[in-house]
Amino acid sequence: MRSNPMTLRLNDLKPADGARTQRTRVGRGIGSGLGKTAGRGHKGSFARKGGGKIKAGFEGGQTPMQRRLPKIGFRSKMARDTAEVLSYQLDKLDAGDVDFVALRAANLVPSRAKKAKIVLKGELSKKFVLKGVAATAGAKAAIEAAGGSVEE
């Protein structure tokens, strides 16, 4: 039986030319073109086993940036212990006396905070008397404009 050249058979299947190439074997003699240094060049960290893996910030022995530049600033422990309460959040409370305990009871101050400070943002519609709670100059003016007062 003669086969049609257009008939596809399993024994005729083969990958396209150039689709499957053998991996390049390096370091197998100078005749291969990739012997001796195996394409890694001469000496240096990249020629070594595990080479090229350098720590972030390593500058080749030069004093690194994080050691050349001076230390600046600090993280204030007072800021960590002081909670900011925005003035419009006070409207959630009933008008009258407001102290640290009342702010914590209304979940306006996290449990880790030791102090609270009122910061101006938004409008105040109720009359509040702040006791033992700090306030910014703008917040103080807004509280007094609404008929309240600040007693530190």
UniProtKB/Swiss-Prot annotation:
Gene Ontology terms, cellular component aspect?
Answer: cytosolic large ribosomal subunit
Top-rank lineage group of the source organism: Bacteria
The keyword RNA-binding is annotated on this UniProt entry: yes
- Composition bias, Gly residues: 28-38
Q: Which Gene3D superfamilies match?
A: 3.100.10.10
Q: Name one GO molecular function term.
A: rRNA binding
Question: What residue ranges are annotated as transmembrane?
Answer: none
The protein's name in its UniProt record: Large ribosomal subunit protein uL15
Origin species, per record, is Xanthomonas oryzae pv. oryzae (strain KACC10331 / KXO85)
